[in-house]
Amino acid sequence: MDKLNIRDILRAQDVTRWQIVRTKKQSVAEHTFAVQAVLMRLVPLLISTYTAPMKVGFEERLLCECIMGAFWHDIPEVITGDIASPVKRLIRDGGDITPLDDLEKKVDPAFIKCYTAAKPLTLAIIKCADLMEMVYHLNEYGDQRANSHSWRVQHGINNAFHEHIHNCSENFPAFKWDVAHGLLIEMLDPSQETDIDSIVNGI
């Protein structure tokens, strides 16, 4: 197989992620949608802090690139399934190009065009949203008992998120990346959920 067809892509709604989360199974499609939802908020927030001269259409183009890249970023999992991060690291310790990388490249040319060949800024923003969504999902549905495996993974991802934000601040200083911290705090706060009564009554 050298290209995914539409049936393969639609299977993303049935391929499960997160082997460590037992309370609610999350499909690749659910994760993809959630990352795109985060990007819909994150990109405008980042743009609002942009200090360099901005070309016409820059915000729309960046948002489009991020949304498209996010669509493809985990699509190879419809073929490979969920591979635990330690296993991925073990495989990739073998060299620059591994069988896993080769398989992902064969999945679909669009995967290469829209994600792996995306601009560094686009990839950085997608990774930011990806980490934020993972922290959110584990916070909502993971085992919150101290030192449980899920709890340790969540804290590890949270640390990776903060490290990524630090690196983004150094590599793309025209943006104020602290807005990502604020958005993540909002995502983790149940009180931020909209109450239907407040909509109906105009509160």
Curated annotation (Swiss-Prot):
The entry's keywords? Cobalt, Hydrolase, Metal-binding, Nucleotide-binding
Positions of dATP binding: 17
Entry keyword Membrane: no
For this chain, one GO molecular function annotation is: hydrolase activity
Catalytic reaction equation(s): dATP + H2O = 2'-deoxyadenosine + triphosphate + H(+); dADP + H2O = 2'-deoxyadenosine + diphosphate; dAMP + H2O = 2'-deoxyadenosine + phosphate
Residues that hold Co(2+) 2 according to the record: 77, 82
* Manner of cofactor binding, per the entry note: Uses a typical 2 metal-ion mechanism to dephosphorylate dATP.
What is the protein's known function? Catalyzes the hydrolysis of dATP, dADP and dAMP into dA. This step is essential for Z-genome synthesis (containing aminoadenine instead of adenine). Specifically removes dATP and its precursor dADP from the nucleotide pool of the host, preventing the incorporation of A into the phage genome and favoring the integration of the Z-base into the viral genome.
| Family, per entry | Belongs to the Caudovirales dATP triphosphohydrolase family.
Query: What is the name of this protein?
Result: dATP triphosphohydrolase
Q: Where does this protein come from, organism-wise? A: Acinetobacter phage SH-Ab 15497
Q: What is the lineage of its organism?
A: Viruses, Duplodnaviria, Heunggongvirae, Uroviricota, Caudoviricetes
Name of encoding gene: datZ
